[in-house]
Amino acid sequence: MARGEKGRGEGPAKSALRKVRTATLVINLARGWQQWANENSTRQAQEPTGWMPGGARESDQPSGPVIHPTTHQKVQSAPKSPSPKPGGYGAGQSSEGATEVSPIKRKEVTKTIVSKAYERGGDVSHLSHRYEKDGDEPEPEQPESDIDRLLRSHGSPTRRRKCANLVSELTKGWKEMEQEEQEELKCRSDSIDTEDSGYGGETEERPEQDGEQVAIARIKRPLPSQANRFTEKLNCKAQRKYSQVGHLKGRWQQWADEHIQSQKLNPFSDEFDYELAMSTRLHKGDEGYGRPKEGTRTAERAKRAEEHIYREIMDMCFIIRTMAHPRRDGKIQVTFGDLFDRYVRISDKVVGILMRARKHGLVDFEGEMLWQGRDDHVVITLLK
């Protein structure tokens, strides 16, 4: 009974102590947040004001920063009545809280302000309007503006876009000029034919009209010389020859033609042409007979398999070289049974590799085929 009463007496005391600790923790946390809010508001008030829309109209007003009292400052400015704190927390604790460092971590963040698309619209339109002109340099007496610096710099996206458009227009203009020249020659030949036939109409007004047409044509575009025409033709041919789009289109067309031709020769395809396959197949003795077509995946797999088999042949020759001492003539001889017992631990293709090595002239043995158990006494000679 005494232990139960003692436990009941300690329960309220522990709960009261827990409440006091919780209240203390909340008070310290609130004090830290209040200190951080005060420091943040003071820092923001001391920082210079940034750019705001309509800054030209606001320049007439005094440039001093306007500080609006926050809710935290209003609460602090109001008179506070001292309230009793449990656990003996009085003015001493408040003085200690003022001197202690705020537990809230702060980190400086640098933010770059980038103008929006609608804000850059005016500059882009001004740049495009200026570039559409003849591209005159600014007058020497005028100071160089930001627009001139953008136009002179190589990193201007507007300038790159305009240059690309200008190049594309020039390439299109070459073809149009050729067509116009052909049309003019055709019209002149037709007019000469009509004059010779006598159905040209009034002969007095025609020379004046022809002169006006020639003048208008000269105002639009001067007549090119023979050298200029030759240069333009070369440029047009070069553009047609080295055009990226045309080159890509030609490559796709070439691939499509090759695919159609290969499907006609493929016996597993629905488009297989038996007569074409029989007429184009290789016969014994022709170059490439019995081998896959160069550049295909079958040829790549065959090359990898050949390299793998060659490595295994070299490994077998090395094993034979380590099994016995060379004779006086420099050749090494081992029996098939001993070689089989040694090499079977490395690979199970003992007979196949031996046959391949004999084909390449690296080893020699009697008989066309070797059988384990029956041909264990057969001597295998390493030639190289």
Curated annotation (Swiss-Prot):
* Annotated region (Interaction with actin), positions in chain: 243-288, 355-384
Annotated localization: Cytoplasm, Myofibril, Sarcomere; Cytoplasm, Cytoskeleton
Which Pfam families has this protein been placed in?
A: Costars
Species of the source: Sus scrofa
Biased composition, class Acidic residues, residue ranges: 134-145
Q: Does the keyword Transcription regulation apply?
A: yes
What does the entry state regarding organ or tissue expression? Specifically expressed in heart and skeletal muscles.
Q: Where is the composition biased (Polar residues)?
A: 35-47
What UniProt keywords apply to this chain's record, in alphabetical order? Actin-binding, Activator, Cytoplasm, Cytoskeleton, Phosphoprotein, Protein transport, Transcription, Transcription regulation, Translocation, Transport
Q: Which gene carries the instructions for this protein?
A: ABRA
What InterPro entries does the annotation carry?
Abra, Costars_dom, Costars_sf
The UniProt regions of compositional bias labelled Basic and acidic residues, in chain numbering, are: 1-11
Entry text on domains: The actin-binding domain 1 (ABD1) is intrinsically disordered, and binds to F-actin with higher affinity than ABD2.
Described function: Acts as an activator of serum response factor (SRF)-dependent transcription possibly by inducing nuclear translocation of MKL1 or MKL2 and through a mechanism requiring Rho-actin signaling.
Q: Could you tell me the superkingdom of the organism this chain comes from?
A: Eukaryota
Entry-annotated residues carrying Phosphoserine:
S156, S191
Which protein is depicted?
Answer: Actin-binding Rho-activating protein
Q: Which residue ranges are recorded for the region named Actin-binding 2?
A: 303-384
Q: Which GO terms describe its biological process?
A: positive regulation of Rho protein signal transduction; positive regulation of transcription by RNA polymerase II; protein transport
Give an example GO cellular component term for this record: cytoskeleton
| Complexes and interactors | Binds F-actin and ABLIM1, ABLIM2 and ABLIM3. Interaction with ABLIM2 and ABLIM3 enhances activity.
Can you provide one Gene Ontology molecular function annotated for this UniProt record?
Answer: actin binding
Q: Does the keyword Transcription apply?
A: yes
What segment(s) does the record annotate as region Disordered?
A: 1-20, 32-159, 181-211
Q: Where is this region: Actin-binding 1?
A: 202-302
